[in-house]
Amino acid sequence: MKRFLLTITSALVLSAAMAFAADSEEGFVQIFDGKTFNGWKTATEHTNAWSIRDGALVAHGERCHIFYVGDPKPFKDFHLKVDVMTQPHSNGGIYFHTKYQSEGWPKGGFECQVNNTHSDWKKTGSLYDICNVAEPSSQDNKWWTQEIIVKGNNVTVKVDGKIVLSYNEPPGAQPGKDFERKIAEGTFAFQAHDPGSTIMYKNVRVKRL
């Protein structure tokens, strides 16, 4: 009887966990198919920095950004989830509220840092030069899920479900001269930072809020 009850309890726990996982992904849309660059456009510089391998966008090479162009409607309030893995000493980033730019570091929007062991002290989850995280919350050579949630004037960043940053943009904030870093609207982009960095991005999904 005890074994029977234990089996039922285990089944109920598993069922609840599966239901929670399904609910947590409800409303999300995949924006990278894992096979092609459909819906994505690279900058015009160093385009060979980008490839697709094992279902992931792979960034390795001189500076080049790849932008999501698959939806003409800009994203304002949203919840973005990306599975990320870095090799040691790599630097990269996930941009939001940005727009296509043919070369250079993107001026529009924010960069959410991807960096566990690169020499730059601003680590994974930082809103670059706005609200920085000094301690890494993820590890090289292991996949993690990086989430960016924008609602109103708040930006929340999670790594594997744990909040690593919550930023409230102050009233009257103005765009910067060189880099705007101002909550507005726009698209997403990933960064290939330098030849010494290798970063994989996959399972890219987003939900409008």
Positions of PLM-derived features:
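Carbohydrate-interacting regions of secretory-pathway proteins
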Residues: F20-L209
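Positively charged n-region of N-terminal signal peptides that target proteins for export
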Residues: M1-F4
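Bacterial N-terminal signal peptides
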Residues: T7-A17
